[in-house]
C-alpha cells in the first residue's frame, strides 16, 4: 500500500490520537505492488517516531454531555409512588384472577405484556396459560374466530407451549388458501399477521398466512377505526415479535389510553411503573457515565466513537426489568469496550499492530503489553481490568471462575476482527458463506451474550458454562447473525466509503453478479429465516429462560437500532428519541 505524505515533518507525540487528523493517507497499490506502510519521521535528533498510516471514520461526536447525564433525576423514587404501585398491582392481580372467559383472559394477558408490566405477574400469567393449554374444550370456544385463534396461538407459542399450525386450517379453503372472506375481518387479519412471526422452519401455512395478511393489510381502504388503523400501520412497519419490549411498552401506553375499553387502573400501573423503572435507569446511567469518565479511554483514544448512552440503550433492549440492573451495568461496560476496540481494528490500527493486539488478548497476560504501541496498551489494560473485575464479582458471589469463558469470547472476537483486517489490507472479497462464518462473531454478539449470562444467571456451574458459552449455543449464533445482517443493511455503504471489508450485501453482489437491491432483499429474507430457527431454539433449548430472552432481545434491539440507519455509530433522530423516551422523559400522569 502506497503512502502519501501530506505535511512537513514536525515533532510527533504518540499521545496525539485526535480524530480527523490522519498522519498519512492510504492509497491502494496497483495489483502485485508491494505495500509500504510505515514511514519514519525525524524532526530532531531527540525525537524519532514511527509514523503509521491512520484512517479517519468521520464519526459524529457524542451528543450527550457528561454534566447533563449526571443531572438526570426524577421524583419517581418517592415512597408515595412505590406504595401506589403496590396497591395497583394487587388490583390488577385480582382482575387476572377474576377473568373467566377464554378471550377475556387472552386479551388481558396480551395487554399486560404490551404495557410492559408482565414481569410483575409472571406467576399468575403462567398459571392462566397452563390452564388454557390443557383445557380440551378451548378450541371449540374460539372455533371460527380468527382474531381469538391467532391470539391464542401467539401467546401460547411465546410462552413455550406447542401449538400446531394446523389450528388455522379451518380458515382455509379447499385449495389450501386462506378464505377471501377473512379480508373483511381487519382485527382478525392483524392478529393472524402478528401470529405468523412465531413460525418455525417448514411451517408453510404460517408462511402463507404472513403473505396473505401482509398483502391485504397493506391495501386496506375505507373507514377503519383510528386505533385499529394505528395498530395495523405499527405492525406493518415492524411486527410485534421483532419489537424492543420497553419501546413497545412506551408506544402502547399512549395507544391503550385512547381505547374505549381501557382499564384505568392497568393504565395507571403501566405509567407509574414506566417512570419508576426509568428512575432506576437514570441512576445507572449516571453511575456508568462516571465509570467511563474515570476509565479515561474516550479521552485518550480520540479516534474512537464515544457512545455511552447508545450503549446503555442496547442494555435496556436486552434486559429491561429493574432486577437485571447488574446485567445492564456489565453490558454497558462491555459495549463501550467493544465499540472502542472495533474502531481500533476498523479505523486506527495498522495490520502489524492488530496482529500484536490479537496475540495479547489471546494470551490474556499483561506481559504481552510490552510489544504494543502506547494507545493499544491503554486499550488492552482497560479491557483486561474491566473483564477481570466482572469475573471477580462472579467468583465472589457464586464461587465460579468465569475468566476462561470471558477471555475466550474476547479472543474469538479479536481473531474475527483480524480476519477482516487481513481481507481489507489484501483487497480480498470473501464469498458470502466465508464472510458470514466469521461475521457473526465479529459483530460481537457472542461477547455480549456470554457476559449477559454470567451477570444475570443464578447458580452458575462450570458444566452449564461449558455447554452454553464454551461452544456458543445455536441461539447465540442466530441472535448474532441477525445483529450482523441488520448492521450490514444499515451501515455497509458508509463503512465501504471510509475503508472497510465488503459486507454481506457486497459479498452477495460480487458472488452472484446481482444488483444492490436484490442483495438487500436476500439479506432481509435471511433475517426472516433465521428468526424461524431462533423461535425453535426458544421453544426447545434447555438453557435458562432469562438467557434465551436476552438472546432474542439482542436480535430485536439490532433491528430497532439499525432500522433507520446506523443508530449506534452515527446516531440519528430515532435513536436519540428512544433514549429520551426510555431514560430522560417521564410519562405525564393524569392529575387526580
Swiss-Prot record:
The catalytic activity of this protein is classed by the Enzyme Commission as 4.2.3.111, 4.2.3.112
Q: What is its main location?
A: plastid
Cite the record's tissue specificity text: Expressed in young developing leaves. Barely detected in tepals, carpels and stamens.
* Residues reported in the UniProt entry to bind Mg(2+) 3: 487, 491, 495
Annotated residues that bind (2E)-geranyl diphosphate are located at: 305, 342, 346, 484, 487
Cofactor comment? Binds 3 Mg(2+) or Mn(2+) ions per subunit.
Where does the transit peptide lie?
1-42
Q: GO CC annotations?
A: chloroplast stroma
Q: Where does Mg(2+) 2 bind?
A: 342, 346
Cited InterPro entries: Isoprenoid_synthase_dom_sf, Terpene_cyclase_plant_C1, Terpene_synth_N, Terpene_synth_N_sf, Terpene_synthase-like, Terpene_synthase_metal-bd, Terpenoid_cyclase/PrenylTrfase
Which GO BP terms sit in this record?
A: diterpenoid biosynthetic process; geranyl diphosphate metabolic process; monoterpene biosynthetic process
A single Gene Ontology molecular function, please? terpene synthase activity
Q: What does this protein do?
A: Monoterpene synthase converting geranyl diphosphate into alpha-terpineol. In vitro, can also have an sesquiterpene synthase activity, converting farnesyl diphosphate into (E)-alpha-bisabolene (33.1%), alpha-bisabolene (18.7%), beta-sesquiphellandrene (15.8%), beta-bergamotene (12.6%), (Z)-alpha-farnesene (10.4%), and (Z)-alpha-bisabolene (9.4%).
Q: What PANTHER family has UniProt attached to this entry?
A: OS04G0344100 PROTEIN-RELATED (PTHR31225), TERPENE SYNTHASE 12-RELATED (PTHR31225:SF252)
Q: Which family does it belong to?
A: Belongs to the terpene synthase family. Tpsb subfamily.
Instruction: Indicate what this protein is called per its UniProt record.
Output: Alpha-terpineol synthase, chloroplastic
Amino acid at each position: 500500500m502506497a503512502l502519501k505524505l501530506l505535511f512537513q515533518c514536525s515533532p510527533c507525540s504518540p499521545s496525539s490520537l485526535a480524530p480527523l487528523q490522519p498522519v498519512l493517507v492510504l492509497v491502494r497499490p496497483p495489483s502485485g505492488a508491494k505495500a509500504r506502510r510505515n514511514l519514519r519521521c525525524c524532526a530532531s535528533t531527540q525525537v524519532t517516531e514511527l509514523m503509521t498510516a491512520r484512517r479517519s471514520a468521520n464519526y459524529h461526536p457524542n451528543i450527550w454531555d457528561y454534566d447533563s447525564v449526571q443531572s438526570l433525576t426524577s421524583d419517581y423514587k418517592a415512597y408515595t409512588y412505590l406504595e401506589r404501585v403496590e396497591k395497583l398491582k394487587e388490583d390488577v392481580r385480582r382482575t387476572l384472577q377474576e377473568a373467566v372467559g377464554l378471550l377475556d383472559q387472552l386479551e388481558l394477558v396480551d395487554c399486560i405484556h404490551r404495557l410492559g408490566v408482565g414481569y410483575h405477574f409472571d406467576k399468575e400469567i403462567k398459571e392462566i396459560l397452563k390452564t388454557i393449554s390443557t383445557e380440551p374444550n378451548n378450541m371449540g370456544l374460539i372455533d371460527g374466530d380468527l382474531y381469538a385463534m391467532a391470539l391464542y396461538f401467539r401467546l401460547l407459542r411465546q410462552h413455550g407451549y406447542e401449538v400446531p399450525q394446523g389450528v388455522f386450517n379451518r380458515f382455509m379453503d379447499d385449495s389450501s388458501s386462506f378464505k377471501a372472506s377473512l379480508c373483511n375481518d381487519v382485527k382478525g387479519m392483524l392478529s393472524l399477521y402478528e401470529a405468523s412471526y412465531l413460525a418455525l422452519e417448514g411451517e408453510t401455512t404460517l408462511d402463507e398466512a404472513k403473505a396473505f395478511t401482509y398483502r391485504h393489510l397493506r391495501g386496506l381502504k375505507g373507514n377503519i377505526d383510528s386505533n385499529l388503523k394505528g395498530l395495523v400501520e405499527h405492525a406493518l412497519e415492524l411486527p410485534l415479535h421483532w419489537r424492543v419490549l420497553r419501546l413497545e411498552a412506551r408506544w402502547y401506553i399512549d395507544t391503550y389510553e385512547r381505547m374505549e375499553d381501557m382499564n384505568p387502573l392497568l393504565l395507571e400501573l403501566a405509567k407509574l411503573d414506566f417512570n419508576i423503572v426509568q428512575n432506576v435507569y437514570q441512576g445507572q446511567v449516571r453511575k456508568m457515565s462516571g465509570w467511563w469518565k474515570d476509565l479515561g479511554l474516550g479521552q485518550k483514544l480520540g479516534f474512537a466513537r464515544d457512545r455511552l448512552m447508545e450503549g446503555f440503550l442496547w442494555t435496556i433492549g436486552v434486559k429491561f426489568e429493574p432486577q437485571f440492573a447488574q446485567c445492564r451495568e456489565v453490558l454497558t461496560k462491555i459495549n463501550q469496550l467493544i465499540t472502542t476496540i472495533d474502531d481500533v481494528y476498523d479505523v486506527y490500527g495498522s495490520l502489524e499492530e492488530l496482529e500484536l493486539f490479537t496475540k495479547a488478548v489471546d494470551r490474556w497476560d499483561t506481559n504481552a503489553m510490552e510489544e504494543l504501541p502506547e494507545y493499544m496498551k491503554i486499550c488492552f489494560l482497560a479491557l483486561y481490568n474491566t473483564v477481570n473485575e466482572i469475573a471477580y464479582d462472579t467468583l465472589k458471589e457464586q464461587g465460579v471462575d468465569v475468566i476462561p469463558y470471558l477471555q475466550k469470547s474476547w479472543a474469538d472476537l479479536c481473531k474475527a476482527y483480524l480476519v477482516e483486517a487481513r481481507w481489507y489490507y489484501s483487497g480480498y472479497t470473501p464469498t458470502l458463506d466465508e464472510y458470514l462464518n466469521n461475521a457473526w462473531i465479529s459483530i460481537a454478539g457472542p461477547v455480549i451474550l456470554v457476559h449477559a449470562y454470567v451477570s444475570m444467571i443464578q447458580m452458575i456451574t462450570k458444566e452449564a458454562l461449558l455447554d452454553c458459552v464454551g461452544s456458543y449455543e445455536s441461539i447465540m449464533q442466530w441472535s448474532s447473525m441477525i445483529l450482523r445482517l441488520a448492521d450490514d443493511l444499515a451501515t455497509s455503504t458508509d463503512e465501504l466509503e471510509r475503508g472497510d471489508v465488503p459486507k454481506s450485501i457486497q459479498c452477495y453482489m460480487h458472488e452472484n453478479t446481482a444488483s444492490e437491491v436484490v442483495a438487500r432483499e436476500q439479506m432481509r429474507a435471511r433475517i426472516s429465516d433465521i428468526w424461524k430457527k431462533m423461535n425453535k431454539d426458544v421453544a426447545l433449548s434447555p438453557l435458562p429462560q432469562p438467557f434465551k430472552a436476552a438472546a432474542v432481545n439482542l436480535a430485536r434491539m439490532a433491528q430497532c437500532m439499525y432500522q433507520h440507519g446506523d443508530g449506534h455509530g452515527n446516531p440519528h433522530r430515532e435513536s436519540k428519541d428512544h433514549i429520551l423516551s426510555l431514560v430522560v422523559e417521564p410519562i405525564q400522569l393524569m392529575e387526580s
